[in-house]
Amino acid sequence: METLPIELGLLISRYTGINEITKYRTCSKNSKKYVEDVLTWFDVKCNNKVFGGLNMFANVRKLDLQECRCITNESLSALTNIETINLRSCYRITDNGLEYLSNIKEINLSGCYEITDSGLRNLNKAVFVDISNCPQITVKGIVKFGKNASIVIDNCPLIKSKHVNLLIDIELVKITRNNHPFLSYKPRHIYEKSTNNHIMTHQTKIDKPKFNIDDLKFSSDSSDSDLDAISDVSYVVGEVSDDDNSDSGSDSSSDSSDDNSDSSDDSSGKNTSKSTITKTQKATVEYANDYISKRINSKRKILFDKIYYHPINKRDDIFMKNYEDLLPNDQLNSRQESLNRLFEDKDRKNFTENLKNKSLDILIGGSMGLYCVYKNTNFKPNDIDLYIKDINLHKIKKIENAIYKSFLFDRIVVVNSPITITWYLQLKSGKITSIQLNKFNIKSWAEMFITYHTDLTCIGYEIITDRFVYMKKRWDRILTKNKHYFSCILNLDTASSIRRSCHKYAERGFNCVCINTDFKKYNQKSESDDPFYDDDDDDEPRKKKIHKKKYPKVINQLMISYYGIEEAPSSLPNRAGSLGNILDDDNFVNTLINKYKGIKNISFSSSIRHFKMEKFFPDIMMMCLYKVNKYMKYPDSSNGTEFHQFSIEKKKTYIEKTKKFFDISRSETKISHESLKIKCLECCCYIYLNHLISKYYSNIHHKFSARRDSDSSDFDDPYDSDTEYNLVCKHMLRSFSKKNHKDRCLVLSVI
């Protein structure tokens, strides 16, 4: 090829794979020089498999290395002549690496959080610089560029808006948005998962894959799990458009493809109830699943960035909209009809009014908001999900007091997990209901709704303003889309929990698709099917781990270090995610025990115990694979993926107080039985356990009120062979028999 004219060589290179070109480069010295000359005519994009060795791109003019997290300072030493480079999320790049880029004209350093003002001094010739998400850059760093360079400074905490406005007024800097055709953020497509490490722009224009119904015919030996996965992701590729910014256009165009795909899926599903998929069909579905996941992932992160870019006091005004703005609509109830649904239960209405009287800025979210405003619902939620701004102990006690004033119940169970407090109530009618308070330290509703795994539930009732609000660019999409995606992009839910939620809403009449990282449906018989399962350095036999559900190692480390707890609870084991009507007291308590048996800090009490908490609440936000204020690196990750599971201020005093937040309180609490409306509290007995549900039981702490006449002879030997649980049951039964109580006031409380 060296003897061919350069024009003909370029034409051949456009239709040749990059692997073939690089292989030809190794043939001889002449071929090496020829390939390097040819590459100067291409804009080269690299995928995240690049580990270094950029010498062959020494003469390339434009190079895209975004999210190539293994690129180091040494890798840039061969790029001294490059003019345009994209280093977005290459977090290993430091100020030393920028010394090799002194001739650069356009550069994207977004997410390179090791860069400081000193490193920017090397970019003297730059006319476009994106330093978004660089927490160490100050105003001094951007002033050096002058007004001849365009600077992008989104989400730089050390650059205050008042300083930037002043510099703009006196024309010292030129601030802009990143609309650069080569350096702006564009999510990587599925074809970049090929074995090639480098991709040339001129060769990568590939149409969306077109799925044919005939390609997804199965043989007669199919498993239900595989068929479920196929039905989830077979025809979703056309759902999302290429343009991330054209929301309305993509929605309308995707609906038509949804209708066609749904009808095709229904027609083929009748004849494929017993079949298996081939390797080609499986690869096709993996292709589709990964493609749609990347698109949704990209849009969600962009929206997340926009939320945290704005000041706290403006986030709800920008991203939360009044539900009445969508009216009239054939799919939605009027405001009065929505309120009638919300207050159709008298106890719920009283509870809402009591919260409003206490001036608590609370939002009722979850499925309750969807049920109230959406006409075509075939379900009635039996639980209430609460979110509160600026959470503290005083506000939680107000909520608890409102529960006692609003509901008349026979049994109550208080479960305090690391991220929620749940009150399970067994009412006088026998009905079971639950009230769950999320302990996220949020300042706006937008911060909470961005973590939801589906657009369906991004609506709620704001009590203090007496209106329904929804998240813009999320919930309003359900009015134009026929398919609803469930994903764990910015939350800590396991794949199995996401799939259960997906099935729950599918049973409620919605067309739902679960987007998982793995092709296989989660199966409890195989932990490897769950992408969140981690069995590294675990000598426990496989048989004992069959039903364990673990979160990623980095989450477990945080839970153990900061909260003293090994595993957080997920959804209830049943698909509906609801307790239902459990009239039997034993079943009511045992069901909750089975749900929370993975938590050690559980205690039984014979009366309602006001949980004692520290005033300092951990700043918890369920964020995965993205950052809020700081980066938290996953040390065992092969590709350097960054995690920010919990936004916690890393101060020693704060950590100590956070630990105390989840420690068990061993002080006796006096209960005023007149205010709790529970018949069984007449005995006023009190039993406290340090640990209840665990493999081995340790000490028993017996604390009884003065009204109970205890006999020392009734106490069992603490070294009795019975388990701690059995000992407590014996003591409780004896106390009840003395007072002739028919009911067992057994109450569970996680401290």
Swiss-Prot record:
Entry keyword set: Leucine-rich repeat, Repeat
Q: Where are the LRR repeats?
A: 79-104, 105-126, 129-148
Q: Which GO terms describe its biological process?
A: SCF-dependent proteasomal ubiquitin-dependent protein catabolic process
Q: Where is the composition biased (Acidic residues)?
A: 256-265, 529-539
Organism, scientific name: Acanthamoeba polyphaga mimivirus (APMV)
Q: Which InterPro entries match?
A: Leu-rich_rpt, Leu-rich_rpt_Cys-con_subtyp, LRR_dom_sf
Record's GO cellular component terms: SCF ubiquitin ligase complex
Q: What is this protein called?
A: Putative F-box/LRR-repeat protein R753
Q: Which Pfam families does the entry mention?
A: LRR_6
